[in-house]
Amino acid sequence: QWIVLYLIAKEFKLTDLKYAFDEILPKYLEYDLDLVEKIDSLNNVDFKELGNNLIINAKYFKLYEDLNQPETFNSLSEFVNWLKKNNYCFLPNGVVVDQNKGDAIISKVISDVMESRKKYKKIMLDYLEQGNIAMYNVYDTYQTAVKLINNAVYGVTANEKFRLFNIKISEGITTTGQLLIRSCTHVVNKYLNELANTKDKDFVITNDTDSIIFTLQNIVNHPTSTKDPEILKEISEYSRMCIDHVNTSIYSMCKNMFYKTNANKSNMFLSLKNEWLANSGIFIAKKCYAIHIVFKEGIPYEKLIPKGISLKKSSTPKALKPFLENVLNNILDFKSKEEIDKILIEECNKLKNVYKFKDIALPISVNDIESYKNLPIHIRGAKIWNSHFAQSDFDKINTGKVKYIYVKRWKDNLKLNMDGEYVISVPDQDKYWMYIEDKIEVDYDKMLDRLIIKPVSAFYSALNWELPNAVTSNNTGVFNIFMNTKPSLKIKLI
């Protein structure tokens, strides 16, 4: 951790090590209590003296044990000179890699997989340019599948059943990725501050494993409603400038933080590309956001992209699946709170007064009802169906698809009311709903909580909005709990 922190400070000429620790050092490495305790006092450092009092101990794998290598280095500069002399590469978790060897098998596999992904992406973009969205979506799925396979190659090194399992290599991959993306975030922010003639403004909204999302506010002044392809190209040019600057900086990072001294385009797998341009986005939490893109890889293209937000869960009734997407689209189209409230209120009214029981019941599967050791809500409801409503053994639930709904009161079953039972599951066939329609009073408060409140509450919180009184006044569940929480996140334009 000390080595990486010092190398970060030297590469970016940061005299404030607290900033380097908080903003750039991989979170994976922030567990050295001694470093955490001393970090506040390590300000205004002298780069020439940095690391001179650092003692570094080395432990060698069997292949290198008999090469008469030093076991201790008395300063950072001594360690760095040893890396350079032997053409070794340093990973942020402390692993040293011999660069004198030929291409490793894992990097060769990754290289081959990436080549196949490039072919799919080229075909995908050709279809997008032609306006053939159906075939574009097909090849987008293909290239995404190849990307997932590629990522799995990295992850499998941490699986002890994998033939080439090596936890140190796996940690090295994780920490290297974290350090690079956090370093690139720092470089992007610094560059955009120069373009905007500002100081210490945070242009980066969020970063992820392999991506950075940043805003161009105060750099470009076109309306967010802009759809002109030429203007979008002009805006994306700023993004390209940022990417070119970062990609140039990556070579310096690799040489000065990892000591990959022979880094060049032929042996570097990491390079950033401009994937999309969006006119709006809402950011709920880490890896949980939605954006409305208007330009994708150089081509005008509009689409809502949710990340970490499931708009159409399999457990959501079919009748309500368009609702959440409609809310998000209107939010990202900058509709007013009053307009969004109206959508919410209308859906609540439809749930109570328009939809039938079977339309709002939650779909789910049952796998051998007697095998459940605990009692999930749909199994609880299935047992009530079997014992009180099934008219024959053929009607009973054992396996298969069911739908469950919350019950406020059983109209002609005192025992179920006395026992406090509150749910009924019904086999997924329309005819069975006739058995219960006149025998239950639906708990619409709970159904509203489950189907409407939970999905939209995060959006309202991020926007610093309160839910409409027309909905909350008659509800005692999640609505009122939410109303008492303090929202912290806000919508951001990108």
Where are the regions that the model predicts?
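A generic structural motif
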Residues: 210-214
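Non-transmembrane amphipathic alpha-helical segments
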Residues: 113-127, 146
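C-terminal reverse transcriptase regions that engage the nucleic-acid substrate
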Residues: 148-152, 156
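Inter-lobe coupling/hinge region of RecA-like P-loop helicase motors
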Residues: 159-172
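DNA-dependent DNA polymerase catalytic subunits
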Residues: 1-109, 128-138, 142-146, 166, ...
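A residue-level signal for conserved active-site and pocket-lining positions in enzyme catalytic cores
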Residues: 117, 150, 478
